[in-house]
Structure formats: C-alpha cells, structure tokens
C-alpha cells in the first residue's frame, strides 16, 4: 500500500536489526486517515470471503481492524492481554510471545462473541515471528470459527512469521513488506495489497 510505505519511509525509525519504530502514526499516536485507508484496503481484499467477525489483539491492531470491520459491516473483537474483572464468563485463551516486548502474554476473548458459524479476518499491526497471529488463530479454532485470512499492516519478511502462517494453510495479506532493517535503512519487498 503506497501511502503506508511512504509513511514508513518518512516517519518510521529503525532502532536495531529487527525493530521499526512507527509510534508517530500507528503504535502510539494514530493517524486516523491512514488507519481508515488500511482498514478499507483489508475490507476490499477480503470482500468476497463472507467475513462475519474481524479479530485483533489490543492495542495497535484495533484501529485498522475497526475500520475494516466497519467497511465490512461486521463486529470487531479485540483479544485482551490481561484479564479484566468484567471478563468473568467462559474465555477462549492462548499464549502469545511478543518479539518486540520479549514477553509471553495470555490473550483471551469471551467465548460468547465467537462461534463455529463465524468466518474470521484476523488483523494485526506487525508480523514478525507470527506468534500473535498464531495465538488468534488458536482462539478461533477453540470456538470452531474458520479463519478466512490474515491482514498485516507491516510484515517483517526477513523473519519467519509468514512462513509459519502459510504452513498452517492461512492466506496472509500484508500492506507493507519489509525485506530488511539493516544499517538504519528500511528496504521493502513488493506488498500484497
């Protein structure tokens, strides 16, 4: 997606071999117009898939997931990383390792929001080792829901996340694919959408 690639070139910062900082428009401060454009793009790509729910993990995946859900006319669910006092019903849970934060979290979704009748589009801000998306897939599997696709805002193609997900038979669509983050420079591959 050209607008996203340009924004990464202009405002993204490489912090190390595997870390890209995009806090001025995605992960801390959010650019609503860019989020809407990304959500709309995901909705266009998956328009014929019969999506009934869009799922993400809190926090940075929420904005593009919400815009995609709005465009598709379906609910959006975000998996929580910490159990809330208000989440006292039966939960779907999975363990997820975060490459950026270097911690493992338990993610959860209330079972009442996801069923075997659902066709799911998973959206996340980054794809590195694939563990976040894999955790969301596990939640869907626990509910019997079918994952129709995975939409990724920024893919670190030099890591093995895409391969992990494709080996699971999943359709992965990334708006920006990064070949490398070496020497402080972002090098891109051709994006999927």
UniProtKB/Swiss-Prot annotation:
Pathway: Purine metabolism; XMP biosynthesis via salvage pathway; XMP from xanthine: step 1/1. GO terms for cellular component: cytoplasm. GO terms for biological process: purine ribonucleoside salvage; xanthine metabolic process; XMP salvage. Its EC number is 2.4.2.22. CDD domains: PRTases_typeI. It catalyses: XMP + diphosphate = xanthine + 5-phospho-alpha-D-ribose 1-diphosphate. The keyword Transferase applies. Xanthine binds at residues 20, 27, 156. Optimum pH is 7.4-8.8. Thermostable for 60 minutes up to 55 degrees Celsius. Pfam families: Pribosyltran. It is found in: Cytoplasm. 5-phospho-alpha-D-ribose 1-diphosphate binds at residues 128-132. SUPFAM superfamilies: PRTase-like. Homodimer. Converts the preformed base xanthine, a product of nucleic acid breakdown, to xanthosine 5'-monophosphate (XMP), so it can be reused for RNA or DNA synthesis. This is Xanthine phosphoribosyltransferase.
């Amino acid at each position: 997606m050209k607008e996203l690639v340009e924004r990464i070139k202009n405002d993204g910062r490489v912090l190390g071999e595997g870390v890209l900082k995009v806090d001025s428009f995605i992960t801390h401060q959010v650019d609503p117009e860019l989020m809407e454009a990304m959500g709309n793009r995901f909705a266009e790509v998956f328009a014929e898939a019969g999506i009934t729910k869009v799922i993400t993990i809190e926090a940075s995946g929420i904005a593009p997931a919400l815009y995609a859900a709005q465009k598709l006319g379906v609910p959006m669910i975000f998996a929580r990383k910490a159990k809330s006092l208000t989440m006292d019903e039966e939960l779907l849970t999975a363990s997820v390792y975060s490459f950026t934060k270097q911690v493992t979290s338990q993610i959860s979704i209330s079972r009442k929001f996801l069923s075997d009748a659902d066709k799911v589009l998973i959206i996340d801000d980054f794809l590195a080792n694939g563990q976040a998306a894999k955790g969301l897939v596990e939640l869907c599997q626990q509910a019997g829901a079918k994952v129709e696709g995975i939409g990724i805002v920024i893919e670190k193609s030099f890591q093995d996340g895409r391969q992990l997900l494709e080996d699971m038979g999943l359709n992965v669509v990334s708006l920006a694919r990064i070949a490398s983050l070496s020497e402080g420079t972002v090098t891109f591959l051709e994006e999927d959408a």
